[in-house]
Amino acid sequence: MKVLVLNCGSSSVKYKLLEMPKGDVLAQGGVEKLGLPGSFLKLTMPNGEKVVLEKDMPEHTIAVEFILSVLKDDKYGCIKSYEEIDAVGHRLVHGGEKFSNSVEITPEVIAKVEECIPLAPLHNPANLKGVVAIEKLLPGIRQVGVFDTAFFQTMPEHVYRYALPYDMCNKHGVRRYGFHGTSHRYVSARACEILGLDYDKTRIITAHIGNGASIAAIKNGKALDVSLGMTPVEGLMMGTRSGDVDPGVLTFLMEAEGLQAAGISELINKKSGVLGVSGVSSDLREIEDAIKNGNERATLAMTMYDYRIKKYVGAYAAAMGGVDVLVFTGGVGENQYTTREKVCTDMEFMGIVFDSKVNEGMRGKEMVISKPESKVTVIVVPTDEEYMIASDTMTILK
């Protein structure tokens, strides 16, 4: 079964064509600068070669049409007919309280996703444009929606509620939803598969650490807690997002700096985090270079970044009454050994006995990085959200 996975953003469309159930990647790439001058499609050939194809793509339907044409292209493609594509799976960011599982997309589902647009005004409309494009270009093909938020619908009310007026929160749908759910679901299940553990009887902390970042507590197969809240700003310090901050600071800055709501939103989403503290970059590779050159603010930013992760790991271990497995994933979690080491150092009281030597040589592959005597297994699992979306698509449509 060939499943095309689409992740449509406001100015990008990422795609992957997978042969299921094996999960073999037949084609992958993405459109960038969608709707802007100089838009292009960047694809990865089977031999690993990167190819850039420039084309004016003012909107999503044209972008998806170009992706489909490249999939069938004699030089760059891997299929002879669109009929070889059996189904399309979409990343849908926000399902609110309406979706606790992945679903086949119907007009009723689209209407419910549209009702969630106020919760994700940038993401949901773009996600739906991908659905509409496929309906137009591949009429009759079945489509499945996989929600970032669905995995966290198992969080109990005392976890997802904010300590704000009860009726006001209900009126506006204000609560913690969590994000990166597809990634947390994949790496937690995959870690148990690698380690031979029963997923439904294991306490797992998953750290999805990239430019956006979140930590989740998963107990006996269900999400108990996650650091991201109603929006992807709560929790950990991120590339440009602040993470946890005293709300009183924001009202203070509104008055002190003359900021309106839009200005505060830009401040905490785009000007804070590692970039805001360091003044250098949101990219941790550039931060590490700055640290080597003696930049004190870069050092401070990195120390804050690692400390926040460590603090959440301890909190979630307490929330679950202990932890059996700690998983690192995401661009930083998979590739930056220094952050993993800082998080796991001096954690013997919690049962973590870290293997620094194994950790230092580990980048981007599945590997246990704790010592055999460690009560908590620390493991790196590269995330594969596209495989998870394709897997859900296959399961639902079969």
Curated annotation (Swiss-Prot):
<feature type="binding site">
    <location>
        <begin position="208"/>
        <end position="212"/>
    </location>
    <ligand>
        <name>ATP</name>
    </ligand>
</feature>
<protein>
    <recommendedName>
        <fullName>Acetate kinase</fullName>
        <ecNumber>2.7.2.1</ecNumber>
    </recommendedName>
</protein>
<keyword id="KW-0808">Transferase</keyword>
<dbReference type="Pfam" id="PF00871">
    <property type="entry name" value="Acetate_kinase"/>
</dbReference>
<keyword id="KW-0547">Nucleotide-binding</keyword>
<dbReference type="InterPro" id="IPR000890">
    <property type="entry name" value="Aliphatic_acid_kin_short-chain"/>
</dbReference>
<comment type="similarity">
    <text>Belongs to the acetokinase family.</text>
</comment>
<keyword id="KW-0479">Metal-binding</keyword>
<comment type="subunit">
    <text>Homodimer.</text>
</comment>
<dbReference type="GO" id="GO:0006083">
    <property type="term" value="P:acetate metabolic process"/>
</dbReference>
<dbReference type="GO" id="GO:0008776">
    <property type="term" value="F:acetate kinase activity"/>
</dbReference>
<feature type="binding site">
    <location>
        <position position="7"/>
    </location>
    <ligand>
        <name>Mg(2+)</name>
    </ligand>
</feature>
<feature type="binding site">
    <location>
        <position position="91"/>
    </location>
    <ligand>
        <name>substrate</name>
    </ligand>
</feature>
<feature type="active site" description="Proton donor/acceptor">
    <location>
        <position position="148"/>
    </location>
</feature>
<dbReference type="GO" id="GO:0000287">
    <property type="term" value="F:magnesium ion binding"/>
</dbReference>
<dbReference type="GO" id="GO:0005524">
    <property type="term" value="F:ATP binding"/>
</dbReference>
<keyword id="KW-0460">Magnesium</keyword>
<dbReference type="GO" id="GO:0006085">
    <property type="term" value="P:acetyl-CoA biosynthetic process"/>
</dbReference>
<feature type="binding site">
    <location>
        <position position="385"/>
    </location>
    <ligand>
        <name>Mg(2+)</name>
    </ligand>
</feature>
<feature type="binding site">
    <location>
        <begin position="283"/>
        <end position="285"/>
    </location>
    <ligand>
        <name>ATP</name>
    </ligand>
</feature>
<dbReference type="InterPro" id="IPR023865">
    <property type="entry name" value="Aliphatic_acid_kinase_CS"/>
</dbReference>
<keyword id="KW-0418">Kinase</keyword>
<dbReference type="InterPro" id="IPR043129">
    <property type="entry name" value="ATPase_NBD"/>
</dbReference>
<comment type="function">
    <text>Catalyzes the formation of acetyl phosphate from acetate and ATP. Can also catalyze the reverse reaction.</text>
</comment>
<feature type="binding site">
    <location>
        <position position="14"/>
    </location>
    <ligand>
        <name>ATP</name>
    </ligand>
</feature>
<feature type="site" description="Transition state stabilizer">
    <location>
        <position position="241"/>
    </location>
</feature>
<keyword id="KW-0067">ATP-binding</keyword>
<dbReference type="InterPro" id="IPR004372">
    <property type="entry name" value="Ac/propionate_kinase"/>
</dbReference>
<feature type="binding site">
    <location>
        <begin position="331"/>
        <end position="335"/>
    </location>
    <ligand>
        <name>ATP</name>
    </ligand>
</feature>
<comment type="pathway">
    <text>Metabolic intermediate biosynthesis; acetyl-CoA biosynthesis; acetyl-CoA from acetate: step 1/2.</text>
</comment>
<dbReference type="GO" id="GO:0005737">
    <property type="term" value="C:cytoplasm"/>
</dbReference>
<feature type="site" description="Transition state stabilizer">
    <location>
        <position position="180"/>
    </location>
</feature>
<keyword id="KW-0963">Cytoplasm</keyword>
